[in-house]
Amino acid sequence: MPGARKAALQKAYIEDNPHPTGKKEQLDAADGGTFYNVTQRKYHPWFRRFLRARGYYDIFLFNLDGNLTYSVFKELDYATSLNTGEWKDSYLGNTFRAAADASSPEKVSFFDFKPYGPSYGAPASFISKQIADGTECRNAGNFQKRA
């Protein structure tokens, strides 16, 4: 994600978020009427309920350029590029590429537990899949579980 966009999103959703580390997901949306904030306000409560109901730790959405455009928990990997940024060689970077490079939108990739830096080194496993419109991949999605 471009530096200015990354900095603005991390400032709004991590640094200026009134909730403490580990509870950043409680903010429905940052102040302001940007398209991102309006969309966050509309969909974030649903993703948060879905995450809790299914027992996930986090849910991620990526565009095909590798930008982490959405995360329920907004940790250090939020708003970064998994193709070029600091987490490109991370476990999450590998899971993004598995989804983006999958030969079919039906393919689901599973990744076993191992320490994940942006989650403060806690063991994490991931499930990744393309998000397709018919047969054309539009985005990639990822679910994170913690041990």
Question: Which stretches of residues belong to each language-model region?
Answer:
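Extracytoplasmic/periplasmic ligand-binding sensor regions of membrane-associated signaling proteins
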Residues: 32, 36-144
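Alpha-helical transmembrane helix bundles of large polytopic membrane transport and channel proteins
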Residues: 1-30
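Flexible, glycine-rich terminal cap/loop adjacent to redox cofactors
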Residues: 147
